[in-house]
Curated annotation (Swiss-Prot):
This is Small ribosomal subunit protein uS11. Located on the platform of the 30S subunit, it bridges several disparate RNA helices of the 16S rRNA. Forms part of the Shine-Dalgarno cleft in the 70S ribosome. The gene is rpsK. It comes from Pelagibacter ubique (strain HTCC1062). The lineage of its organism: Bacteria, Pseudomonadati, Pseudomonadota, Alphaproteobacteria, Candidatus Pelagibacterales. One of its GO terms (molecular function) is structural constituent of ribosome. The keyword Ribosomal protein applies.
């Protein structure tokens, strides 16, 4: 006889089965419950080396995310606008499964994938309410690195 305990997780119900004879426990995960979320915030972090797109609900809970490196781009190809477009497309498709319709976009960083990621989100059918640039700008802070000599 196996004893079944239900453990409520934040997103899914996990059943813990304990076998009395062997005293081993195993976990089985049920299907994830998808919530219907209409509004969200897209965070686009574009550095010189990579582009990371996170899509969260209005409370700040991340629903989906993708990066150029996660999509299989390596090295200097991660910093291209095309890689940012593919990453934004992937994050958007996951967010569309939750029924998301409108986005407020926050862009951070000096990278080349900023505008391309925005266009990819808009092409996926999201209505973009606002675009906010949150790139940190120093008020004459630390000394910048010396110029490259190639």
């Amino acid at each position: 006889m196996a004893k079944v305990d239900k453990v409520e997780n934040k997103d899914a119900v996990v059943e813990k089965k304990v076998d009395k004879k062997s005293k081993k426990s195993s976990y089985s995960k049920k299907k994830k419950i998808k919530k219907n979320i209409l509004n969200g915030i897209a965070y686009v972090q574009s550095t010189f080396n990579n582009t990371i797109i996170s899509i969260a609900d209005t409370n700040g809970n991340v629903i989906s995310w993708a990066s150029a490196g996660q999509k299989g781009f390596k090295g200097s190809r991660k910093s291209t606008p095309y890689a940012a477009q593919i990453a934004a497309d992937s994050a958007a498709s996951k967010a569309l499964e939750y029924g998301m319709k409108t986005l407020s976009v926050e862009v951070k960083g000096p990278g080349s994938g900023r505008e391309t990621a925005l266009r990819a989100l808009q092409a996926r059918g999201f209505k973009i309410l606002s675009i906010k640039d949150t790139t940190p700008m120093p008020h004459n802070g630390v000394r910048p690195p010396k110029k490259r000599r190639v």
